[in-house]
């Protein structure tokens, strides 16, 4: 059986198409409004305050402690875990520092062997973490 045909078929075709749209992943994502319930609430970056520095164990078969920070977002008070990239960059971050957080690259999913961490630290006290790591800039004295 194919599509309904004929002069009086428009309503049936229109309703069918409207119902079938919900099977499309991108349509569902844009129309359900779930983007506003996520920690960033639709934006690409967010500022937050570091609550504590934490180490998260990597998933099997890897064995490591990935350095992360527990951050409370300023815009809505939500607490998230954010990965601190590069070797030794956790030393540039202190508790109560203001950090800029970005997504981690898999559209809201955890990356690699770090379970439950969907964000990464980009800036600390207004200075790029990469610039601090390469020693091109210094962290401002607070």
Swiss-Prot record:
Name by which UniProt lists this protein: Small ribosomal subunit protein uS12
GO molecular function: structural constituent of ribosome
Entry keyword set: Hydroxylation, Ribonucleoprotein, Ribosomal protein
Annotated SUPFAM superfamilies: Nucleic acid-binding proteins
GO biological process: translation
Family: Belongs to the universal ribosomal protein uS12 family.
Chain intervals for the UniProt region annotation (Disordered): 1-30
Organismal lineage: Eukaryota, Viridiplantae, Streptophyta, Embryophyta, Tracheophyta
Coiled coil: none
Family annotation (PANTHER family): 30S RIBOSOMAL PROTEIN S12 FAMILY MEMBER
Species of the source: Fragaria ananassa (Strawberry)
Compositionally biased spans, kind Basic and acidic residues: 21-30
Cellular component GO terms, alphabetical: small ribosomal subunit
């Amino acid at each position: 059986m194919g599509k309904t045909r004929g002069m009086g078929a428009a309503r049936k075709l229109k309703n069918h198409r409207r119902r079938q749209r919900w099977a499309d992943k991108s349509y569902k994502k844009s129309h359900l409004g779930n983007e506003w319930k996520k920690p960033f609430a639709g934006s690409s970056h967010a500022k937050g305050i570091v609550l504590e520095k934490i180490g998260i164990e990597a998933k099997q078969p890897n064995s490591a402690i990935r350095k992360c920070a527990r951050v409370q977002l300023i815009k809505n008070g939500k607490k998230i875990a954010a990965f601190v990239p590069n070797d030794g960059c956790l030393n540039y971050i202190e508790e109560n520092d203001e950090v800029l957080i970005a997504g981690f690259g898999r559209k809201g999913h955890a990356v690699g062997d770090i379970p439950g961490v969907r964000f990464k630290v980009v800036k600390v006290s207004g200075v790029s973490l990469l610039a601090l790591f390469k020693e091109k800039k210094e962290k401002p004295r607070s």
